[in-house]
């Protein structure tokens, strides 16, 4: 019995000891040594290139579209219409060899060139189309599209017409040109408004010689009975001074002097007269600007033809005529400087007109103009 109790006690002690050991705190573990630094990581190896992707399979070809119907052929363009060319017959009033027609020969070439092919002007000398000095009638009737002449040849139509080319004792060339551009042309067109002629400009030149003669002129008495070719207001004054005045076209003067039909003439300036060879048939050339201090020569157009001309060509003709006027004045100024000594070299006496002749003409002219102005409002 005692043995069983003892065995039970020993079992209880053993179980208690085991429980105590299980419940006692565990000793703290020794600190772990610091870990060694980690070695630097080796560089990562470059990745192997990715294998090239397999080529995509070629797409199946799209079915070809049905061909579009061929377009109808475009109609052939109409042939270009040729630019209109304005053909012009233009006449001067003097012979082909005269300085004025020679000037126009060159001037027409310039106009045709400036027109760029739209102008085709053909020049004619005085008498070739219309009778010489009747160029106005030729333009009025449409025989000529253009013409140039002297207004004094129209005295049979208008008493005031002579005032536009020149007046005895009147304006100098530059003054006459300025007056023509500003007042003269409008007045001239007003005077002839009932006709088929329009003035678009004018050419100006130097003073004329007073007279060329086969006979000496020493006093105003020598004018009386003299057979002289003259035109315009100068002719009227010579008549009032007692001369026997005839009107001849420029191309007939040489022969009339040569044959004795006339004793003297007034044509134009020494440079112009030289081109008509008057040095062969005169003995004296008398100089003075009083009889004709300038010469303004209108440039005329046929109104019906002018109405068909485009504004661009109208402007070209008008503006180039202004330039041509000054060019001709310059040309003839130089020609006079050459001609006067040339006349002397041919044996012609080149002299100033005697003062009493010059004064007599100026006095008669002043009275004449006053008388006509009192009669005719337009003349005034």
Across the structure, where does each feature detected by a protein language model lie?
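Short, low-complexity disordered leader/linker segments with a strong preference
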Residues: 1-87
